[in-house]
């Protein structure tokens, strides 16, 4: 009986050894699959346009000494989507008083921007005819997208902080990297 008992113990030990050796290998392959982005395509979430901005909700931000317009972001419209897009309404004002209001998005991961809609005088939105993702230009006279991305929204291809952190940076004119703006 002790031989059978010993045989069962050896068999159990062998089974346990096999069991404990296999899961790490399986776990490793699952771990690698979880981070394998090849073949996975990014998908943008459905868009909900915000209300057009009120002047009391606008946060002005500095773009550059060569900017030909002044810019402000509507704090009520700022959102961070589950798709990794920061969406916001921006108001561009010329020295003569003309205003352009647009609802836009920035993807930190790809350093791209997109215009979703433009405000009409009656407070409604007109969808952009060119709603494609485009590279952000940092060296134009009006480089508001580059300023928002590098100074307030993005760091190392990731969103830098949550909604409230970004709003605090904008309100205090405290860029992420003090050498790049402010």
Regions found by a protein language model. Name each.
Residues 11-22:
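Bacterial N-terminal signal peptides
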């Amino acid at each position: 009986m002790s031989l059978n008992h010993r045989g069962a113990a050896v068999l159990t030990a062998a089974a346990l050894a096999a069991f404990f050796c296999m899961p790490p290998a399986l776990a490793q392959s699952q771990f690698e699959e979880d981070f394998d982005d090849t073949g996975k395509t990014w998908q943008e979430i459905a868009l909900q346009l915000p209300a057009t901005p009120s002047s009391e909700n606008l946060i002005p931000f500095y773009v550059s000494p060569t900017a030909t317009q002044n810019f402000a972001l509507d704090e009520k419209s700022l959102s961070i989507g589950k798709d990794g897009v920061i969406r916001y309404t921006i108001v561009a004002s010329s020295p003569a008083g003309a205003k352009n209001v647009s609802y836009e998005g920035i993807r930190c991961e790809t350093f791209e921007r997109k215009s979703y809609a433009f405000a009409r005088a009656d407070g409604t939105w007109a969808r952009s005819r060119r709603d494609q993702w485009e590279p952000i230009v940092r060296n134009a006279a009006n480089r508001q997208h580059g300023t928002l991305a590098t100074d307030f929204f993005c760091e190392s291809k990731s969103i830098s902080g949550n909604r409230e952190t970004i709003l605090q940076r904008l309100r205090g004119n405290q860029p992420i990297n003090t050498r790049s703006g402010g």
